[in-house]
């Protein structure tokens, strides 16, 4: 079952259970999928990687909005955004541990032959491909900078 199909099935379940927070989050995902499909053109389909990137983008937007609401002293809106982000995160693959992230980034650094922080771009490109969907770009960047020193 593709991610788009899971979202459609969960949308129906959320409507039946009258869960407003889930319904809003899942509708946002479905809308984003439809928007991406319309941009690709007729007769095309989204790849699993594209679907994951869309969900990651939605989660990141919700988390950033929650931080803004929190800084503006609007806890009720912040809680809503966090709840939606948590619902959307269920569609993402499990995050990898810090030790696993370190191991993968070290392997990428060896493979690319990076020696200093000036090789950051080369390492980041390879690391993002390898860790797509498993770790956040900020986490990967921080780990690469830490290891390159």
Specify the residue positions occupied by each region the protein language model found:
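Charged, compositionally biased, marginally structured helical/coil segments
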Residues: 1-149
